[in-house]
């Protein structure tokens, strides 16, 4: 169930923006990039006719439709879009208190499961060395492409950390994962822990 509030002032502002696009049937699409992670960002984009996904949730508003990415809906729970006019024109604000909160179930996309394990189990251990690891992308064959940062970049123990720590943890927690691969440039040793 969709639990997002778009205030009247935000609807008026968005409707005016959409009218300037001169595109019949244009709406907005709301989604969260990197949901459930500290890097989560809540986004609003134009959604031209035909650009909405079949699984999107739709909110019919006065003069336009708002589409919500299905994968993002749990992270948009209790979100509020508001517009506050001021002397400089105004500001559109999006508050999504659950966008950074991990919400994982058996049905969650594999990317969300990987991010959950990385940010809640792996990175707290790497943080003691000033390091971190993040998911760059997931290949079509189920391989997690990872990037190390901070003290892990250039660290001489990164192979051991990858195989015995990160990969082992991810493979135990996410059996559908085919494996992991590191794409970090470890020749830069300026922040390396070892």
From Swiss-Prot:
Cofactor remark from the record: Binds 1 [4Fe-4S] cluster per subunit. The cluster is presumably bound at the interface of two monomers.
Domain of life: Bacteria
Protein biosynthesis in keyword set: no
Extent of the signal sequence: none
Binding site for [4Fe-4S] cluster: 152, 155
Gene Ontology terms describing biological process: iron-sulfur cluster assembly; protein maturation
One Pfam family, short name: Fe-S_biosyn
GO MF, one example: 4 iron, 4 sulfur cluster binding
Keywords: 4Fe-4S, Iron, Iron-sulfur, Metal-binding
Cofactor: [4Fe-4S] cluster
Family of this protein: Belongs to the NfuA family.
The protein's assembly and partners: Homodimer.
Function: Involved in iron-sulfur cluster biogenesis. Binds a 4Fe-4S cluster, can transfer this cluster to apoproteins, and thereby intervenes in the maturation of Fe/S proteins. Could also act as a scaffold/chaperone for damaged Fe/S proteins.
Protein name per UniProt: Fe/S biogenesis protein NfuA
Species assigned in the record: Teredinibacter turnerae (strain ATCC 39867 / T7901)
Gene name, Swiss-Prot/TrEMBL: nfuA
């Amino acid at each position: 169930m969709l639990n997002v509030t778009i205030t009247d002032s935000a609807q008026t502002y968005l409707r005016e923006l959409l009218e300037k696009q001169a595109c019949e049937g244009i709406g907005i699409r709301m989604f969260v990039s990197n949901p459930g992670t500290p890097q989560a960002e809540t986004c609003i984009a134009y959604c031209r006719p035909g650009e909405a996904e079949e699984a999107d949730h739709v909110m019919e508003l006065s003069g336009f439709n708002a589409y919500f990415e299905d994968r993002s809906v749990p992270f948009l729970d209790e979100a509020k879009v508001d517009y506050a006019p001021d002397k400089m024109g105004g500001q559109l604000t999006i508050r999504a208190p659950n966008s950074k909160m991990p919400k994982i179930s058996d049905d969650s996309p594999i990317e969300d499961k990987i991010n959950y394990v990385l940010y809640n189990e792996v990175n707290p251990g790497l943080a003691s060395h000033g390091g971190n690891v993040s998911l760059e992308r997931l290949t079509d064959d189920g391989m997690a492409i990872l990037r190390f940062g901070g003290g892990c970049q250039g660290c001489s123990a990164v192979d051991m950390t990858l195989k015995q720590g990160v990969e082992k943890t991810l493979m135990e927690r996410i059996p559908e994962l085919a494996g992991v691969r590191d794409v970090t440039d470890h020749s830069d040793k300026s922040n390396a822990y070892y």
